[in-house]
Amino acid sequence: MRGIVTIDGPSASGKSSVARRVAAALGVPYLSSGLLYRAAAFLALRAGVDPGDEEGLLALLEGLGVRLLAQAEGNRVLADGEDLTPFLHTPEVDRVVSAVARLPGVRAWVNRRLKEVPPPFVAEGRDMGTAVFPEAAHKFYLTASPEVRAWRRARERPQAYEEVLRDLLRRDERDKAQSAPAPDALVLDTGGMTLDEVVAWVLAHIRR
């Protein structure tokens, strides 16, 4: 496979799991834009930087030399040699990552990190097919109802379903400006599908 595949969608739509599996099947790297935003949010929390302080946050990110290690089996984020990956999927990070991702300077920083990776690769996020890689050869947008997505997320986190659903609905509202399918993307509702079925559907379209 040559070129770029983008897989976008809202939170807990399955895009990360699908992108990882698709990349592995194609034998190409997998890029997680969300992991970079999560790293920025985590570092802001740990350093006591206001998540809305764009200048302070960018100085922190550049000073620590944050970088993404893109691999087919998964991504890692390093900051000054420290692997941040184990700390990035927590309720605390969930609650501030949207505020961080809305900062134009941070979005530009993430996009630069992603564009440092030479194709071919599979990139997942919210606006990979629109803002970051509009030239991608294959574009997909995965979605599902908030209830389905909250149920998926609750299985992964030590949180009650109702709390997860509330957080997810708030994040959907905050992220709606960034999360929309590209005009030429194939849109799939994954609510009634297994992971294997979604991966097979995406691969079938890529291999046509």
Curated annotation (Swiss-Prot):
Reactions catalysed according to its record: CMP + ATP = CDP + ADP; dCMP + ATP = dCDP + ADP
Positions bound to ATP: G9, P10, S11, A12, S13, G14, K15, S16, S17
Main location (coarse class): cytoplasm
Keywords: ATP-binding, Cytoplasm, Kinase, Nucleotide-binding, Transferase
Broadest EC class assigned to this enzyme: transferase
EC number, as in UniProt: 2.7.4.25
InterPro entries per UniProt: Cytidylate_kin, Cytidylate_kinase_dom, P-loop_NTPase
A single GO molecular function term of this UniProt record: CMP kinase activity
GO cellular component: cytoplasm
Disulfide bonds: none
Gene Ontology BP annotations: pyrimidine nucleotide metabolic process
Localisation: Cytoplasm
Pfam families, alphabetized: Cytidylate_kin
Family: Belongs to the cytidylate kinase family. Type 1 subfamily.
Full protein name: Cytidylate kinase
Species whose genome carries this gene: Thermus thermophilus (strain ATCC BAA-163 / DSM 7039 / HB27)
Lineage summary: Bacteria, Thermotogati, Deinococcota, Deinococci, Thermales
